[in-house]
Amino acid sequence: MVASEIKSPVSVPETPGSSSVHHRKQLSVFFIESDNRRLALGRGYTGGTTPVNIHGKPIANLSKTGGWIAAFFIFGNEMAERMAYFGLSVNMVAFMFYVMHRPFESSSNAVNNFLGISQASSVLGGFLADAYLGRYWTIAIFTTMYLVGLIGITLGASLKMFVPDQSNCGQLSLLLGNCEEAKSWQMLYLYTVLYITGFGAAGIRPCVSSFGADQFDEKSKDYKTHLDRFFNFFYLSVTLGAIIAFTLVVYVQMELGWGMAFGTLAVAMGISNALFFAGTPLYRHRLPGGSPLTRVAQVLVAAFRKRNAAFTSSEFIGLYEVPGLKSAINGSRKIPHSNDFIWLDKAALELKEDGLEPSPWKLCTVTQVEEVKILIRLIPIPTCTIMLSLVLTEYLTLSVQQAYTLNTHIQHLKLPVTCMPVFPGLSIFLILSLYYSVFVPITRRITGNPHGASQLQRVGIGLAVSIISVAWAGLFENYRRHYAIQNGFEFNFLTQMPDLTAYWLLIQYCLIGIAEVFCIVGLLEFLYEEAPDAMKSIGSAYAALAGGLGCFAATILNNIVKAATRDSDGKSWLSQNINTGRFDCLYWLLTLLSFLNFCVFLWSAHRYKYRAIESEEDKSSAVL
């Protein structure tokens, strides 16, 4: 290890009696260019983030690579992945119930667990991309795995050997549990191909947005604008995939059967894979920086070993950093020292006893320590979005059950209940279409931010709108329930009430769509910009992890509510008969939890210190 370039200044006293507070305030003088916020090092590539080609060599002419053309190849891959993901989420519960003859509740729990594990395990994909494979090869490997899983699901739905006997299994027999159950090996096959698909999605999800953002030139004066528009277009591709899944795939399933429906997803993924690989010559790549988990572990171990060392010790030399412009981490710029989480600075505390070539488990660079600080600093923001994911998960089940009791006709056209979740997607599509022409000019006048609102402000707007959405859902469900009881539908919970339209649900759907587009797009952009250079994919995985935890949290909340509200007759807020249950009370509970979560977010966002600013204009926009 190269000797430290940063030495202890003469002006700093080394007497044990010095004030600890004084030394905390002065600690940053041991690192060059220190400040509470990081200056962006000229937004150039001198810090180790030089774009390279697929062979790992620097790109001589950036004009022939990257940009919007390369990004559109990536959009196609994400649209197909989301189409498959939502296509499975909306169809798999029904497939397990109607075809595999599994109980509805266990089918729903199995799919919720699949969705949760798929999203939560995105951290693994982000780790592999940042540590060893790079984002391109991670996407290439896992998108192929995704395709293999979809082909397996298609075969399982198409070949009779993989499903139980369907003869003499009408709807009444199905409800009474008299149909032939799926054999254990048939369920094992289904779960195997399903989780192959899930882990394929987990590898793609944290990498696609980061890889797309990598295609833009950090030295360009329009970089921030391009990045802002990229994440909006990226989420637009996500939305288009969801809309196709909730309409075309549902239609194919109803008209042509399960095999064709899942086959449609496999064909779409195959085409998107071909397009993704066709764009290979255009892509800009970033070199993986080595195992980020190892670097985090080294910082924690080194800080623990030196927990009793003092910054005023006579053995103290300075805070360690390698000389030169580049950091010791491949693909990462140096990160100046910050004054929070002082206890972690012990890992970079260079003592005389460390010698000329100390172990990385005893002495870490300032940049390495700051990486860990950033990861810790980021945690509260995506954590606050778990509540939004919980609400979205509840909507997928609760609002569909509401729709079964309502009139879904548009003139002479009857809309399938399973198509109802398309409306949040349509509202997202509309909001993204109007974002730059309507929202940005209006909010620019209010905030003075050239982009309309900062990333954290957009996350906050999304969380606030989600509170309004779930509050409205509670109001309407209370009205729907009383209407059903007063008009003799109390025990006919699968019968549509002809005079009460399902399109009252559009209000909560559209509001949650608005909440989603502001919160998730703002969060993705925030995590990409704030994550360390060599941990961009892990930063993006934070958002997916929050989504997965939201799925699990919804299951846990439902179980708690059932146990806490069950009466002597076995009825609870979540009774199978929606008209005798109290879904409205659950919506009120979600409203309260969402409000408390929003308060926590405001506190966390107010305390957050942005990692990088470039100008005074950006400084003012960084305040929530």
Curated annotation (Swiss-Prot):
PROSITE patterns cross-referenced by the UniProt entry: PTR2_1
PANTHER family: OLIGOPEPTIDE TRANSPORTER-RELATED
Gene Ontology terms, MF aspect: transmembrane transporter activity
UniProt protein name: Protein NRT1/ PTR FAMILY 6.1
Pfam families per record: PTR2
Subcellular location: Membrane
Family designation: Belongs to the major facilitator superfamily. Proton-dependent oligopeptide transporter (POT/PTR) (TC 2.A.17) family.
GO biological-process terms attached to the record: oligopeptide transport
Topology relative to the membrane: Multi-pass membrane protein
GO cellular component terms, semicolon-separated: membrane
Post-translational modification Phosphothreonine, affected residues: T138
Gene3D superfamilies on file: MFS general substrate transporter like domains (1.20.1250.20)
InterPro entries noted in UniProt: MFS_trans_sf, POT_fam, PTR2_symporter_CS
Transmembrane parts of this sequence: 83-100, 114-134, 139-159, 184-204, 230-250, 258-278, 378-398, 422-442, 459-479, 504-524, 537-557, 585-605
Tissue: Expressed in flower and siliques.
Principal location: membrane
Gene: NPF6.1
Keyword annotations of the record: Membrane, Phosphoprotein, Transmembrane, Transmembrane helix, Transport
Annotated segments matching region Disordered: 1-20
